Structures are given as structure tokens and as C-alpha cells.
């Protein structure tokens, strides 16, 4: 879908660039495939802020998206493509031959009326899901599982995808958007195609209020705070912080490596950092 620009009648409309969603379904979601969603405002069960700069925003209904594609071997037809406020990608309502309905992530080039299926051997066309081992090398995929049966975890945001680049002793080598190459079990499922709404990266919200509609509050830098609020706070006039960048809790940030999962290091064939050198 194309980007939408506006006549510069106001300063915010001059800056505003959004995705044209005129081709999406305009009604309400299927009620049986939705759940209520309460807003936490960034607070935990003690009422304390655990995630800063969250709060407000429009009330949202959660759509139950099928990341597992559990109904195997049953063809389904795409009934409509919908907007989902909980994610950057669009979702597709599919209707199985036996009448069941489900939401899936809508890939690019998937249209209303297209047939999709999940199974052990499927055609390489957008929306079909199958084990990584059954898909040819070079295939563009999304919604990739890391554990068999857990559901897709990789490449679910708007415009993202992964590519199958090789095979190795029951594993498949997958190249991610970051440049990382990773071993994933061949039995893990993935869906063919790249995720819809690739223009999401080009939008401009135009005004602060649109950020508030999304539940995001103003983000304050540490150097603008008082010493009681942040290690960079205080000082007479404008100061640079006077130390290496740290988080509000004193831990190093801005370039400090935070990965701490040695158990899965063996599955990383090529680091995403190698591409930068």
C-alpha cells in the first residue's frame, strides 16, 4: 500500500506521512477471535513504573493471531485483510474449508480470495506455511519458529523477512534482517513471503499528539533531570553528563553489549556485527 501525504493546511499535516489503509476491511474484527486488553500504563502488579514513558493511548482490542498454524493440511481462503492496532503488520482473516476462522499475519502480495494452506509439503507461495526443511534454499520466509510447535517468533514486524541460505545436518541456516545467520531445526515451521506493510518504516507521525494516541509519553533525557532522578542529572546550566552514558539505574548503555545467553551461541553461524566491519 502507498504512502499518504496531506495538504499543508496545518504544521502537523505538513509533516504527516501515513500508510494508505483504504484497501483494508473497514468493519470490526471477528468477536470470537478477539480478547479484552487492559492498559498497564507501564506499571507492574505493585503499581510501580517498570517501563517508563508509557500511558494513555486509544483503547485496543487484542486480536488472537495464529502464529502456530495448527490446522494442517486443510486449505483456507483469505476472506479479508485487516488493520491490527497491536502490531505494525496487517492481519488476514482466513476461512478454512470446514468453516473455521483464524487470523494470520498477512504477507506481502496476499490478496482477498487467495488460497493458503499449512502442511508438510506446500507450494512456495505467500501465506503457505511448512517446515523449513521442506522449503527450497533461497526462499523468503517470515513468522519463523525457533522451537518446534512454539509458534513463530522471528520476522513478525511490518516488512520483515528471513531467507533460507543453506542446510546442515537436520538444521536450516536462516539469514535474518540484522545480517545474523542462525541454525534453526528443519522441523520448525515458517510462512512463505515477507510481512505486509513495508512502508511502515517511512511514516512520519506529524505531531506529538499522534504519539500520545499510541500510548507513548514524552521521553526525557537524563541530562535534563535532577541528580535524584538520573546519574546524568544536575549541574549548573547545560552539562554533558560528565561520565560515560549510563541508564537511570547506573548500568552502562549506548554500545554496551547486553547479550547473555551462552546456551544459544552455538546456533549463531554468523554474527550480525560482522556485517558492520
From Swiss-Prot:
PROSITE patterns to which the protein is assigned, alphabetical: RIBOSOMAL_L2
UniProt cross-references to InterPro entries, sorted A to Z: NA-bd_OB-fold, Rib_uL2_dom2, Ribosomal_uL2, Ribosomal_uL2_bac/org-type, Ribosomal_uL2_C, Ribosomal_uL2_CS, Ribosomal_uL2_dom3, Ribosomal_uL2_RNA-bd_dom
One GO biological process term: cytoplasmic translation
GO cellular component: large ribosomal subunit
Residue numbers spanned by region Disordered: 222-277
Function: One of the primary rRNA binding proteins. Required for association of the 30S and 50S subunits to form the 70S ribosome, for tRNA binding and peptide bond formation. It has been suggested to have peptidyltransferase activity; this is somewhat controversial. Makes several contacts with the 16S rRNA in the 70S ribosome.
Protein name: Large ribosomal subunit protein uL2
Organism: Xanthobacter autotrophicus (strain ATCC BAA-1158 / Py2)
Gene: rplB
Amino acid at each position: 500500500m502507498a504512502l499518504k501525504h496531506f495538504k499543508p493546511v496545518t504544521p502537523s499535516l505538513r509533516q504527516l506521512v501515513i500508510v494508505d489503509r483504504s484497501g483494508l476491511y473497514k468493519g470490526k474484527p471477528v468477536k470470537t477471535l478477539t480478547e479484552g486488553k487492559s492498559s498497564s500504563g507501564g506499571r507492574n502488579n505493585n503499581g510501580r513504573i517498570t517501563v517508563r514513558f508509557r500511558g494513555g493511548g486509544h483503547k485496543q482490542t487484542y486480536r488472537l493471531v495464529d502464529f502456530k498454524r495448527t490446522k494442517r493440511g486443510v486449505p483456507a481462503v483469505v476472506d479479508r485483510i485487516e488493520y491490527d492496532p497491536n502490531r505494525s503488520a496487517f492481519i488476514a482473516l482466513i476461512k478454512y474449508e470446514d468453516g473455521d476462522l483464524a487470523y494470520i499475519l498477512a504477507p506481502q502480495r496476499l490478496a482477498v480470495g487467495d488460497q493458503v494452506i499449512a502442511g508438510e509439503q506446500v507450494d512456495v507461495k505467500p501465506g503457505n506455511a511448512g517446515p523449513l526443511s521442506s522449503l527450497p534454499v533461497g526462499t523468503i520466509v517470515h513468522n519463523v519458529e525457533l522451537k518446534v510447535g512454539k509458534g513463530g517468533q522471528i520476522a513478525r514486524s511490518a516488512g520483515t523477512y528471513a531467507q533460507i541460505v543453506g542446510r546442515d545436518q537436520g538444521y536450516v541456516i536462516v539469514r535474518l534482517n540484522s545480517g545474523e545467520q542462525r541454525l534453526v531445526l528443519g522441523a520448525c515451521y515458517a510462512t512463505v513471503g515477507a510481512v505486509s506493510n513495508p512502508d511502515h518504516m517511512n511514516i512520519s507521525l506529524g505531531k506529538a499528539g499522534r504519539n500520545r494516541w499510541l500510548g507513548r509519553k514524552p521521553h526525557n533525557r537524563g541530562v535534563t533531570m535532577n541528580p535524584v532522578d538520573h546519574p546524568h542529572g544536575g549541574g549548573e546550566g547545560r552539562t554533558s553528563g560528565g561520565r560515560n552514558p549510563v541508564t537511570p539505574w547506573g548500568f552502562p548503555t549506548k554500545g554496551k553489549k547486553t547479550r547473555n545467553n551462552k546456551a544459544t551461541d552455538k546456533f549463531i553461524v554468523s554474527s550480525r556485527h560482522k556485517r558492520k566491519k
